[in-house]
Amino acid sequence: MKLTRSIGLVQAVAMVVGTIVGSSIFVQPSEVSRAVPSFGGMALVWMAAGALTWFGASICAELASAYPRTGGVYVFLREMFSPAAGFLWGWAMFWSMHSGIIAAIAMVFARYAATIVPMGDLGIRLTAVGGILGLSAINYVGVRPGSAVQTGLTITKIAAIGVLLVLLLGPGTLHAPVAAGAITAPGFFRGLVAGLFAFGGWHMVTYAAEETRDAERTIPRALMVGTAIVVVVYLLLNGAYLLVLPFDRVLASTHIAFDATAATAGPAAASAISVLVIVSSLGAISGIVLAGPRVYYAMAEDGLLFKWMGAVHPTFRTPHLAIVAQGIWSSVLVLTGTYGTIVSRVIYTEWIFFAALALGTVGLRRRSCNPQPNEERKDRKARKESQNALRSSRPLRSHVEYAPAFRAWGFPIAPALFALICFLMVINQIASTPRDALWGLGLVVAGLPVYAIWSRRRPVLDTREAAARSAGL
C-alpha cells in the first residue's frame, strides 16, 4: 500500500511557514535581548539566524530534489553516510526532538488557552494532550485533511501577524532604540541559539516527499519561498518590538508580543495575542504531527523499526500506526512533565546533523563531478556491496547518480560556513552547560548499540528488493 500524492506547492509552503512560526517568536526576542543587550546586537542576531536558516533550507532543497523520498533528513543521511547515521536521526526524533517539541508547543497552547478559560495544572496538561491527539486524529484520516488544516492555520496566523504589525507600527507608538550593554562573542552565540530555536522546523516539509506532487521541484520552491516569508516576518516583528517598547522593558518582558500590544493598543487588544499564540501553536503542532511519522515509516520500510510502524492505512493512505505511536509518546511527555528537560538537553544536537548534511552535500557534489567508472567497475562494486548487505542484513543505499534538480547557492563557501557555525554553536552549548549538553549527546549516541542490535535481528532482504525500496521504486 503506497502513500498518495496530495500536497501541492501552496500546502508545502504553508507547511514550511506554519511549522516554523509557532510560539517562540512571541517570547524569544526577550531571550535574545538578554544575550545581546543592544538594538544593533539584536538586529545582527536575527539577521544571522535568518541567513543561517535560509542557507540550511537551500541545502535541504538541493538534497530533496536529488532524493525526493519519504523520510527527508533520514534519507539524506542514509544516502550520504550510512543507514546508522539516518537511524540516529530518527532515534533522536522519536524519543526527544520531535515528540518533545510537540509536547512543549502543546503546553504553550494549553497555557494560553487557560488565560481565556481558567483551569488548573491538570486541566492544562489534559488540554495539551487533547490538542496533540486531536491533530493526530485529523492527520490519521488523510494527508489531504491534515494539510488543509495546516494551510488554514498558517493563513490565519500570518494574517493575524499582519494585523499585529499594523497595530505596533501605528503613528505615535515608536521609541528611539537605545543600547543597554556590550556585545560579547559568547553572548552572540547564546542569542543565535535562542533565535534559531524560533526558526526551527524548516526541514520538515522534506519528510512527506512521496506525498508531494512533483516533489523534486515543489519541495525546493516551498523551502525557499516559505523560509523567505518567515525571515521577513521575524525581522519586521522584532523591529516593531524594539521600536515600540523601551529597551529595559524588552529585557524584562516574558511575553513581549503581549506587552508591545498593550503599550500601543491597550489591554483589550493585547488579550487577542493569546488567541494568536493559540492558533500559531496549533499550526506548528499540526505540521510536526504530519511530518514526523513519515520518518518512522521510512525507517520501518528499511527494516530499522518495527514493521507495523511502516503500515499504511488501506482507506486513508497514511502511516496511521506511526502517527498513533508519536501521539501517545508526546502525550506521555506532557503528562509526566519530562518534555522540558529532554528537549532543552537534546535539541542542540540537531545542528550536528545539519552540519553533516552541509558537508555531505559538498562531498556529493565533488563525487558527481569526477569521471564515472566504466560499467565493469560499477557492476563489480554493486555486486560486492550486495554481498556485504546480505551478510550484514543492513538496508542498501540507492547509489543513484547525484543529479539534483535544484542546487544550493554559494557552493562551496556557503555550505562550509553553515557547517562551521553549526559546530561553533554545538561547542558553545557544551562549554556553557557541559553536564546537560553531554547528557543530551549521550541520549543520541545511545542509539548506536540499538542500531547494531536491530540491524542483526532484522530479516535479510532480497538485494534487488532493498535497492528498489531505497530508490523509491
Locations of the language-model features?
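Membrane-interface "cap" regions at the ends of multi-pass membrane proteins
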Residues: M1-S30, R34-F39, T53-S58, T70, ...
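Hydrophobic transmembrane alpha-helices that form the core helical bundles
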Residues: E31-R34, L44, T53-I132, S136-Y140, ...
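Membrane-interface loop-to-helix entry segments
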Residues: G123-P171, A182-I183, L223-M224, V346-L357, ...
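A generic transmembrane alpha-helix motif of multi-pass inner-membrane proteins
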Residues: T349, G410-L473
